[in-house]
Amino acid sequence: MKHFILAMVALVQLSCATQNSSTNEDNSMKKLIKTDQPIYIENKTIDEVIDFTSYLDAHLISEGVYQVNVKSGITFKKCVFKKPVSAFRKMEDGSVVLTSFQGNVTFIDCFFEEDVNFRGSSIYGRTDFTNSTFDKSANFEELHCHENAFFNKCIFEGALRFQNAFFNQRVNFMNAEFYDTASFQNSLFNSELQFSAGKFFKYADFTLIDCRGRVLFNYTEFRDKADFSHSIFAQDLGFINTKNHTTNFDSCRFLGKVRFNNLEVVSALSLTDSYFMFDIPEINIPSEKLMNSK
């Protein structure tokens, strides 16, 4: 009985110490950000809400839009986030608070158990979420990445939103898996876009994207509909060995070389009203599955 009581006391003390450690860690991170010191956290389970908009005073940048300016480099490796992680906040009066990161934003080999929201964030350093898992929704709408951005080997279990995003340098989603809807509508990619060997299990929205560099979707699987309609591909597009259900490239402009070799198409591939600056690529699929302009 004595040993049991001692064990229980030890567990209570350990629990309290863990809670205090998590709270203290959050407080110390806030202090570091306030003093522009870099953040580096590895192999931690974080049971606190991470809200970058709450660590610094926000300043008005336009009507109804405020912004905090984080000068610290942010690095998390092999961490588990039990609560939401956010760099966006909507206030009761309808105004919003965004976050500008002057350094890198790095979450490598991390696991997010709740929603992640970087809507409207500007990241002036490297963006790196390599090999991280998003168990709930991930919102990167209107994200501005000024350096290379890495989302390779990521797993997105919930809905993914990248509408109206801007990428100034290379973007890498190689070997990423998307288990819910994924939208990149109206996003601009100023350099190479890499999606090779990705897997989309639900609707993939790439309508109205503007791709200024080379685009690679080789060996990618689209289990549901994929829509690239009304998009611009200024340089080469690689779409080799892809597996498609219903894929639309209607009203697109292809200004570089296009490769559609060895496609698998379950339902249809549509290129209606699309323009090719060079020769129309050879597409070896049954004619009834290929839709072209008359």
What is each stretch, according to the model?
Residues 2-8, 14-294:
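Intrinsic low-complexity/IDR segments
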